Amino acid sequence: MTQLFRKIINDPVYGFITIRHPFIFQLINHPAFQRLRRISQLGLSHLVYPGAIHNRFQHALGAMHLMQNAIDELRVRGVEITKAEEEGLLAAILLHDIGHGPYSHALEHSIVGGVHHEDISAGLMDQMNRDLNGGLQLAIDIFNNQYHKPLS
């Protein structure tokens, strides 16, 4: 009997989010991803709107949850998505903003001119891919729009 992997995270927007893949849970626990807990999704908005305290960690988990919903719906509609593709899609969306720095877009070009957060995201994903023995390659290909699903 195959034992299912399931971790549940209580999200302030979507409620309970289920993590179905050990590799995705490993990504969430990676120090590069955990740093997103300290990076504001809404920049300096909290100075005007005290309730604007959403962080990049919460945003990434919510985006991953919505991607999981989209994958499930596509499968219901007959679209074949392999387990590897599912993990790659979830990892790519989970890490899409990993390159953001303090206060997100508000300081993006002030700290290092001419460098976009997408470039930093790609560099961090490459480093994480090395840390994870190539386990992120499909996600990186998806992130860089280099993955093309083979036709059946």
Model-predicted regions and their roles:
Residues M1-I39, L47-L90, G99, Y103-S152:
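Sequence-structural signature of the catalytic-core scaffold of metal-dependent phosphohydrolases
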